[in-house]
């Protein structure tokens, strides 16, 4: 009789399934962004109409769409914009909105305050991108709304809707990180199609920046060729870049235009210039954006003939850059009554500056420890050890050999100080980087240590006085302080053809002198 076979061991249990994405997150309240990109079938219905709620819910979770879908949205929206006039005409009731600057989650709040785009007419005054870290989400969502509501939602061009600024600030980098350069180029083509101005109710001129000494009538705007990159000077540039003078309504000089020293291009226009333009064109007021406002809006001096504010600035990005601590506002105009609705900022996901990843963020800590080890290794050499092993080496001088090693120790010590400052003062470094246009600190700040960082200046003379005294433990606590620190970013960035720009500045000043005198205006 055969012996019974030994019992076989039971097979090991299958491994547990991997945890769902985000299950191991430290902050459980922050959901993991969707990894799935929306497809054409999910974004568009069978008739090719965008499902705006599906897109909105996905973007709010930091989700993305297929690149081809992003291109389709951008191109379809651009086709609608190309059919519009350079100066569109819109009717009340309407809600007018100012700068958005990539603050997508605040844009969602704006629509809560202003009303659903399905039954509310909207006019946006430009600057949808740059500075904020959700610019492409703003573009995709607004372009989908334009596709859905082409006759009730209107988009104007701001000074940031151009290649020059989006390359200099954050939008191009954001497009390349989240999508591709193809998406960025499609956005630039779409931006070239945006109208430059709107005539609201035959009463208000709506524009991003303001007036130009070369624009006297509304027909001058209508005749402009807008399908191009905005030039560094001229009427198109002025519509996007000009500002009211600081002493608007209380001018010491009656000259209408002076060189805009804050922007480094275009002009300041004053109260008499606005009143003359309004009277010549039978208008009530000019509504513009382009400047952050503590309350989200500003009403300027009233016209002596109509009793209505001659100029209104509206700004719709609350707590701009996460440091201004300002309110945002939208302007609702209905039945000849104008109402301002303010709102505060909404919570939003955090991005490190310039879309830095956590590994790059951790490098200062690693670098500090490595340099500490190198310093300790080199520092153990005694004078006796330095004297040994061939004094004839290094030009035959032991002193030269010792000096070479000491120089290495000093160099590594300098590196250690840089990494130490980066780690210990990371919050201040981030703040300074966020307030400089290139996202980079001034040369030598970190190597000089904490004291140098305290007295760091940004890249232009105009910002020096504002940022002097900025110390690492200090938090920006007022609107005016943030505006002063950020002033360098209000300038037109330097162009590759810098020589031509110098000529343009002289030409602009000469043009203002020839046509309007030489009024001097103090910049904000």
From Swiss-Prot:
- Reaction equation(s) it catalyzes: O-phospho-L-seryl-[protein] + H2O = L-seryl-[protein] + phosphate; O-phospho-L-threonyl-[protein] + H2O = L-threonyl-[protein] + phosphate
- Cofactor: binding details: Binds 1 Fe(3+) ion per subunit. Binds 1 zinc ion per subunit.
Indicate the impact reported for residue 420 to A: Does not affect catalytic activity in absence of calmodulin. Does not affect interaction with calmodulin
Chain residue ranges for the region called Autoinhibitory domain: 474-496
What ranges does the record give for the region Calmodulin-binding, renumbered to this chain? Answer: 401-415
Q: Which cofactors does it use?
A: Fe(3+); Zn(2+)
Q: Where is this region: Disordered?
A: 1-25
Cytoplasm in keyword set: yes
This entry's Enzyme Commission designation comes to: 3.1.3.16
Effect of changing residue 352 to A: reported as: Severe loss of calmodulin-mediated activation. Probably prevents recognition of substrates
Its localization reads: Cytoplasm
Biased composition range(s): Pro residues: 9-22
Q: How is its activity regulated?
A: Activated by Ca(2+)-bound calmodulin following an increase in intracellular Ca(2+). At low Ca(2+) concentrations, the catalytic subunit (also known as calcineurin A) is inactive and is bound to the regulatory subunit (also known as calcineurin B) in which only two high-affinity binding sites are occupied by Ca(2+).
So what does mutating residue 365 to A actually do? Moderate loss of calmodulin-mediated activation. Probably prevents recognition of substrates
What InterPro entries has UniProt attached to this entry? Calcineurin-like_PHP_ApaH, Metallo-depent_PP-like, MPP_PP2B, PP2B, Ser/Thr-sp_prot-phosphatase
Spell out the molecular function terms from Gene Ontology. calcium ion binding; calmodulin binding; calmodulin-dependent protein phosphatase activity; enzyme binding; protein dimerization activity; protein phosphatase 2B binding; protein serine/threonine phosphatase activity
What, per the annotation, is the impact of changing residue 418 to A?
A: Does not affect catalytic activity in absence of calmodulin. Does not affect interaction with calmodulin
Q: Report the Pfam families cross-referenced here.
A: Metallophos
| GO CC annotations on file | calcineurin complex; cytoplasm; cytosol; glutamatergic synapse; nucleoplasm; plasma membrane; protein serine/threonine phosphatase complex; T-tubule
Q: Which residues are Zn(2+)-binding?
A: 127, 159, 208, 290
Task: Output the superkingdom of the source species.
Answer: Eukaryota
- Residues engaged in binding Fe cation: 99, 101, 127
Function in brief: Calcium-dependent, calmodulin-stimulated protein phosphatase which plays an essential role in the transduction of intracellular Ca(2+)-mediated signals. Dephosphorylates TFEB in response to lysosomal Ca(2+) release, resulting in TFEB nuclear translocation and stimulation of lysosomal biogenesis. Dephosphorylates and activates transcription factor NFATC1. Dephosphorylates and inactivates transcription factor ELK1. Dephosphorylates DARPP32. Negatively regulates MAP3K14/NIK signaling via inhibition of nuclear translocation of the transcription factors RELA and RELB.
Domains: entry comment: The poly-Pro domain may confer substrate specificity.
Q: What else is known?
A: Unlike for protein substrates, PPP3CB activity towards synthetic phosphatase substrate p-nitrophenyl phosphate (pNPP) is increased in presence of the immunosuppressant complex FKBP12-FK506.
Please state what the protein is called.
Answer: Serine/threonine-protein phosphatase 2B catalytic subunit beta isoform
């Amino acid at each position: 009789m055969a012996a019974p076979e030994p019992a076989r061991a039971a097979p090991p249990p299958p491994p547990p399934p991997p945890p769902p994405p985000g299950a191991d997150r430290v902050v459980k309240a922050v959901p993991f962004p969707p990894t799935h990109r929306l497809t054409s079938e999910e974004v568009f219905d069978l008739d090719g109409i965008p499902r705006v709620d599906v897109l909105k819910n996905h973007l709010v979770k930091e989700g993305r769409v297929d690149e081809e879908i992003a291109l389709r949205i951008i191109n379809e929206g651009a086709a609608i914009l190309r059919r519009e006039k350079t100066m569109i005409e819109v009717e009340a009731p309407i809600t007018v909105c100012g700068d958005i600057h990539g603050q997508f989650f605040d844009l969602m709040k704006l629509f809560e305050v202003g009303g659903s785009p399905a039954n509310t007419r909207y006019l946006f005054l430009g600057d949808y991108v740059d500075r904020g870290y959700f610019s492409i989400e703003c573009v995709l969502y607004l372009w989908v709304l334009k596709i859905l509501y082409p006759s009730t939602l209107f988009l104007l061009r701001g000074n940031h809707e151009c290649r020059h600024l989006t390359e200099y600030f954050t939008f191009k980098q954001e497009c390349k990180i989240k999508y591709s350069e193809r998406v960025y180029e499609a956005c630039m083509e779409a931006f070239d199609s945006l109208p430059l101005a709107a005539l609201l109710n035959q009463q208000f001129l709506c524009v991003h920046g303001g007036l130009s000494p070369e624009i006297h009538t509304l027909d001058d705007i209508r005749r402009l060729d807008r399908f191009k990159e905005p030039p560094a000077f001229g009427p198109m540039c002025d519509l996007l870049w000009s500002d009211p003078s600081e002493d608007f309504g209380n001018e010491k000089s009656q000259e209408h235009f002076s060189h805009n020293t804050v922007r480094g291009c275009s002009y300041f226009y004053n109260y008499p210039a606005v009143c003359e333009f309004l009277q010549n064109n039978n208008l009530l007021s000019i509504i513009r954006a382009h400047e952050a406002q503590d309350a989200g809006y500003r009403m300027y001096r009233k016209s002596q003939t109509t009793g209505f504010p001659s100029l209104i600035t509206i700004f719709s990005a609350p707590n701009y850059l996460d440091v201004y601590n300002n309110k945002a506002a939208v302007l609702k105009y209905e039945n000849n009554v104008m109402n301002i609705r303010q709102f505060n900022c909404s919570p939003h996901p955090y991005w490190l500056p310039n879309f830095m990843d956590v590994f790059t963020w951790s490098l200062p800590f690693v670098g500090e420890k490595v340099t500490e080890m190198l310093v300790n290794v080199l520092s153990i050499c005694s004078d006796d050890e330095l004297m040994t092993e061939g004094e004839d080496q290094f030009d035959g001088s032991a002193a030269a050999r010792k000096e070479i090693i000491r120089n290495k120790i000093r160099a590594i010590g300098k590196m250690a100080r840089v990494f130490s400052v980066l780690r210990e003062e990371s919050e201040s470094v981030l703040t300074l980087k966020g307030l400089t246009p290139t996202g980079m600190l001034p040369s030598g700040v970190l190597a000089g240590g904490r004291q140098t960082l305290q007295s760091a200046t940004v890249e232009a003379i105009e910002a020096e006085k504002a940022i002097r005294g900025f110390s690492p433990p200090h938090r920006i606590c007022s609107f005016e302080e943030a505006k002063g620190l950020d002033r360098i970013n209000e300038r037109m960035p330097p162009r590759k053809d810098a020589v031509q720009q110098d000529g343009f500045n002289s030409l602009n000043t000469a043009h203002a002198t020839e046509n309007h005198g030489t009024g001097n205006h103090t910049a904000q």
